[in-house]
Amino acid sequence: MSLRRFLGLWCWLTVLAICGVLFSPRVFLAAPQNSGFRVIRTIPLGGTGEWDYVTVDSDAKRIYIPRSTHIMVLDEDSGKVVGDLQGMNELHGVAVAPEFNRGFVTGNKSEKEGTVYIFDLKTLKLTNSIKSGSIDTDSLIYDPDTKHVFVNNGDGASLTVVDAATEKVVGSMKYNANPEAAVADGKGSIFNDLEDKGQVMEYDAKTLMVKHKYSTAPCTNPVGLAMDKTNRRLYIACRGKGRTAPGVLVVMNADDGKVVTSAPIAIGVDGTVFDPGTGDIFAPCRDSGDGKTGVTKIFHADTPDKISPVADVKTIYGARTISLDPKTHHVFLIGTEKNDPVAPTAKEPHPRPEPDPTTFQVIEIGK
């Protein structure tokens, strides 16, 4: 072979190799030196009512924010309020089922009656409500494979399953533990945090049969849960013991329950998301450690078993729940800019500040 032909072949093979690396869906890229993550927008909303979860519907470009008795609906692009659904009680979270044009929101008509409210995604009108059969009806997810809504009843230590098509309760299960976040793996399983047990449970999405219970140690209080479905890794955000203790982010192999790595985070985390398009993991924490500001800890999955810190984005105190727009790669948090100090007592030596709902806002983090 002539030198010219050899060099030409070598160059061509090099190009093919580079293309294979760039376009392989399983390739992991190192975390960038300068991440560029920052608070790129705040949306002042004010208003009344407490809050828990925030939900982004990236296809409809809407943000859903339940606030005690009503749901504020925002246009994601403009930040304007496009709807405000009234007439509910003690609301927590929203899940959307676009193929049925339905939104589901967890609430409690009373302390003894957990409720799943249903609304029309187009008209933003309430259409139905269902008794959960338990108390403290809290977090929820919609699984498009089973077409079911999986509802966690926190203090009720139970699960309620609602068929999104029929709006009927089609299953239930006792956890004998306090459930927090859940995620569907797209292969027939649901994974769920059991906060007071320091465990993650895996159960069958159709039969509700428990498959496994895995220890989350060194995490003792798992509350946030996200998943890299391609590489079968669970990202578990955990609170520390006590209100002033920092937490930890744990990475677990979903197939065998082994904790492969962990990283410290700040105080009072209450959610986590994984961006499959970038490999970034976000853990929003109520308290950065100074008692005045919050922080969102951002990591990057360099490999399935290795994460590296990317950025600490300071936010307002109390911003601890989060939702991802996978199309823009931006995340959204909620909280109040003003939080009034509360005097300590013998029973509560480290009380949380009292949020001022008139300073309620949405925080958008991105690049």
Describe the predicted segments one by one.
Residues R5, A17-V21, P25-K367:
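Predominantly soluble domains enriched in secretory-pathway, periplasmic, or organellar proteins
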